[in-house]
């Protein structure tokens, strides 16, 4: 199977991470003694798609990866992938933008003295 241009453009570290994810999914399936056919059936995907998942194919939708992880009982960790509380880069950037000091707000004039 030929990989798309967008998949080839992925950074090496991302391709490695996807490959590891696929290998981990394959190992988890085998540890649970699930055949490829049964796993694919439970995830509502074809055996070919499951093979692509287990290879870490970047062209497979995130929803399919989520479905496979659900079948394995591992979907609960998906919510932590981009958890804002764990986003060290984002938190650092946010901290850099914080004001150095905060001044007390000036009281607003009541508008007295203006004719009504």
Give residue spans per PLM region.
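A short, Lys/Arg-rich alpha-helix, primarily the initiator
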Residues: 6-31
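Helix-turn-helix DNA-binding elements, focusing on the entry/boundary residues of the two helices
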Residues: 25, 36, 47, 62-65
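Short alpha-helical DNA-recognition segment
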Residues: 33-51
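Short, basic-rich loop-to-helix N-cap that marks the start of a DNA-contacting helix
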Residues: 57-70
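Short, charged recognition helix plus adjacent turn
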Residues: 79-116
């Amino acid at each position: 199977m030929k990989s798309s241009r967008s998949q080839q453009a992925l950074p090496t570290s991302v391709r490695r991470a996807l490959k590891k994810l696929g290998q981990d999914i394959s190992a988890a399936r085998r540890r649970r003694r699930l055949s490829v056919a049964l796993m694919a059936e439970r995830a509502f995907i074809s055996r070919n798609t499951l093979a692509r998942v287990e290879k870490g194919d970047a062209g497979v939708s995130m929803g399919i990866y989520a479905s496979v992880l659900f079948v394995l009982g591992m979907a609960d960790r998906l919510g932590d992938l981009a958890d804002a509380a764990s986003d060290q880069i984002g938190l650092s950037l946010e901290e850099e933008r914080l004001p150095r000091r905060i001044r007390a707000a000036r009281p607003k004039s009541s508008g007295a003295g203006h004719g009504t």
